[in-house]
Structures are given as C-alpha cells and as structure tokens.
C-alpha cells in the first residue's frame, strides 16, 4: 500500500482532523493490507511466512473490532457496513 492510498483511507475513516489511531482507521488500514495479502497468497500458495502474517493481521483486526463492539456498537456497525466485513 502506497502513502497516497494510506492517506486516503485515513482521511475517509478519521473521526477528526489528523486522526491516525482510532480503531476505525486501524481497521480500515488492516483490511486493505489483508485484502492485498490475500490476492498475493492466491498466486503464491506456498508462501507460508506471508500466510502467518495474514493470520496475525486478521487476529489484530478481530481484536480491534471486538473492542469497538464493546465500546460503541453504532461505530462498530458503521465500519462493518462500510468495509463489507460481514455477510
């Protein structure tokens, strides 16, 4: 993910100007990285080091989502819908 894409995601999901650390921003950035790594692993099936990284990122995102669900269910529902994480 290049710097411009990262800035775009941060601006889109930020709660206020200069927000880089809110759960929504972190979840959006992790989702982008997960999607990119997923496409990489479809082509390189035996890349187990990257697969482990993917699983760690998914776990980290899950933790952030759980935190957001506990703290503010409306923000949780909004980010889920926006990123299309649930069926």
From Swiss-Prot:
* Alphabetic keyword roster: Ribonucleoprotein, Ribosomal protein, RNA-binding, rRNA-binding
A single Gene Ontology biological process assigned to it is: translation
Q: Known Pfam families for this protein?
A: Ribosomal_S15
A GO molecular function term, named singly, is:
rRNA binding
One Gene Ontology cellular component term attached to this UniProt record is:
cytosolic small ribosomal subunit
Residue ranges for the region (Disordered) are 1-23
Q: Which PROSITE patterns match?
A: RIBOSOMAL_S15
Q: Where are the transmembrane segments?
A: none
Which superkingdom? Bacteria
Composition bias of kind Basic and acidic residues appears in 1-19
Function noted in UniProt: One of the primary rRNA binding proteins, it binds directly to 16S rRNA where it helps nucleate assembly of the platform of the 30S subunit by binding and bridging several RNA helices of the 16S rRNA.
Q: Which PANTHER family match?
A: RIBOSOMAL PROTEIN S15, BACTERIAL AND ORGANELLAR, SMALL RIBOSOMAL SUBUNIT PROTEIN US15M
- Subunit structure of this chain's protein: Part of the 30S ribosomal subunit. Forms a bridge to the 50S subunit in the 70S ribosome, contacting the 23S rRNA.
Q: Which family does it belong to?
A: Belongs to the universal ribosomal protein uS15 family.
- For this entry, the protein name equals Small ribosomal subunit protein uS15
The root-end lineage is: Bacteria, Bacillati, Bacillota, Clostridia, Eubacteriales
Q: Gene name on record?
A: rpsO
